[in-house]
Amino acid sequence: MLERSLEVPVVVDLWAEWCGPCKQLSPVLERLAAEGRGTWILAKVDVDANPRIAQAFGVQSIPMVVAVVGGQPLQLFNGALPEPQIRQTIDSMIDQLRDRMPGITAAERTAAEPDSR
């Protein structure tokens, strides 16, 4: 995950099986990641199965979504937000990072090629 975060943002969904809001959020993030076509990557971390990772991110409540950018965590949001708000948060992050992370523009170019559709 850290190595990949040097190229494009890695959005980390910190969740648990028993968490109702987590179950609402996960499909939204998966859909947005697919639409992002490589401009960012989704990683899912079950906090019960990975307590050390949860502790490293400072998880106090779930769902919690952070981005790892250049190996550094960046808090995005907590809770199951409405899809338009999540989309806006991720789009804003991509816009801010586009010039610093060449993997974003490379993914956008690839997605724009006719045979990649």
Predicted feature locations:
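A short beta-strand-turn-helix
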Residues: M1-P9
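Non-globular targeting/processing and membrane-anchoring segments
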Residues: L2, Q88-R117
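Conserved helix-turn-beta segment immediately C-terminal to the redox Cys motif
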Residues: V8-P9, Q24-V45, P51
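A short, hydrophobic beta-strand/beta-hairpin element that forms part of a small beta-sheet core
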Residues: V11-L14, L29, L42, N50-N78
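Conserved redox-active cysteine motifs that mediate thiol-disulfide chemistry
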Residues: L14-V28
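Short alpha-helical
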Residues: G20, A49, L81
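Non-catalytic, surface beta->alpha helical segment in thiol-disulfide oxidoreductase systems
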Residues: Q60-P102
